Amino acid sequence: MEAKIQFIKGLDEKVLPDVRLTRSRDGSTGTATFRFKNPNILDKSTAKEGEITGMYLIDQEGTLETRDVNAQFINGKPEAIESIYIMKSPEAWDRFMRFMERYGESNGLVFTKAS
């Protein structure tokens, strides 16, 4: 099973996100901010599929989800989706990183450490 991201269950998001990670100094918590520029979920053709109910990160281990999803508008038109996934334990961080590794492999993404 390929790792994928969905905003409406059953409808894969094709646009690749910019993902920014932060982690507490002690490693106990972390935040991932996903930004999708012009995602296909905002296309008029996908409007009939249903409403955005959250962001679902799906792989062979299961589903990670967040309800923290916001659209950004420019001149009255939706241009981007920003979603925040919060990890509240070192185990949740490790699980998220496993998902991102699979998602990156499936989509040709690379991890760049901040300098």
Swiss-Prot record:
It is a peripheral membrane protein. GO terms for biological process: photosynthesis. Keywords: Chloroplast, Membrane, Photosynthesis, Photosystem II, Plastid, Thylakoid. One of its GO terms (cellular component) is chloroplast thylakoid membrane. It comes from the Eukaryota. Disulfide bonds: none annotated. The keyword Plastid applies. PANTHER family: PHOTOSYSTEM II REACTION CENTER PSB28 PROTEIN, CHLOROPLASTIC, PTHR34963. Belongs to the Psb28 family. Part of the photosystem II complex. This is Photosystem II reaction center Psb28 protein.
